[in-house]
Amino acid sequence: MTTTKVRPTESFGKIIKFFHLISSLVGADVADENYRVNIITITLIICIVAYFIFTGTTVASVFSENWTYLLEASCMVGSVLQGITKLISAFAFAKEILGIRIELENLYREYEVKGDDYAEALNKSCERVWQVIKMVFLMHFMIPGIDVDTQVGYLMTLTLHTMCFLFGAFGLFAGDLFFLLFLGQPMLFLDLLVLKVKSLNEAAAENSSNAERLLIEIIEWHQYYTDYNLRCNRIFYYINSMQIVTSGISIICTLYIILLGDWPGAYLYILVAFGGLYLYCIMGTKIQTCNTAFCEELWNINFYDLEVKNQKMIIPILMKAQNPSEIKVGGFLPLSVQTALQITKTIYGIFTMMLRFLEENQ
């Protein structure tokens, strides 16, 4: 019994369909050519506005009696701000997101017919995306005029909490999906470069007339790789910055709440906050590793097998590859695990200050 191999375009198509499903649940499927603002989009915006209004009024009414309630409410504000940033970025860069999606679909169609090695690299990229997606997988406000001590008031408040939570969960998930998909492709570009370099070396060793054409393909591929990273940096600039900053602030607020023991859900939420912080930073580190590997693979070209004019063509690319574009946080910090560790050290320092403060006031 023989098993039919799945075509890379089919594998990638399943990923895109899954993304369309999650994005459409929050009315923000901007990667669809026929997308229009709909009732779900409007409902999502209403939920966001309601969350901030009711959180503000609740904190204002409770703050004088219990100031720690402000910290409890602030913990989840970070996640809401992350969701808003992802939503605004999706609308602001809708054309770019749609363009990259079409680009990637065309890339899969173009390279899957070039041989089994290319098809294997494409399928491997889809598997990587699915593996990362599998890693990503109530609120503190009341409605003014609604008595939560009554059954009807409690159910009304709980219903609004649930709507905000579901929209927030799917909204954050949809934003993370596109981040993981787009920033997961440079690893595919590296795999394809390995195959291109192999073909060039074989052609150069045989003094084939195709060597120059293959070299030009590699030069254009490196230019595309650099341009792709720059576009991703532009699209995800605000998302990355908001994700890292709000995750850090949310962790600090949640740690203080844990010390006070006022919110049982804080233990779960702090894991979510740390997960969001490190997920983005790990993807940034993968891009850094990919940049290094991309440069090293260019050095694997058999330089002395090339003609002199072709040797001169490759020197500028080798120089450019040693200074690659990186994904930045706030335009100056590299998105990497090292940055996450620095933030964690800062959080630990603030945490020890909290402990001393509480000990002095006991």
Positions of the model-derived regions?
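Helix-loop-helix junctions within predominantly alpha-helical proteins
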Residues: 2-74, 106-183, 188, 195-213, ...
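Hydrophobic alpha-helical membrane-embedded segments
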Residues: 73-99, 168-185, 277-286
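Charged, amphipathic alpha-helical oligomerization/scaffolding segments
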Residues: 76, 80, 96-99, 103, ...
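Alpha-helical interaction elements in eukaryotic regulators
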Residues: 93, 100, 118, 186, ...
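Individual transmembrane alpha-helices with interfacial aromatic-anchor signatures
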Residues: 130-134, 336-343
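Multipass alpha-helical transmembrane domains of eukaryotic endomembrane proteins
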Residues: 153-157, 176, 196-265, 269-290, ...
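Membrane-helix cytosolic exit motif
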Residues: 283, 341-360
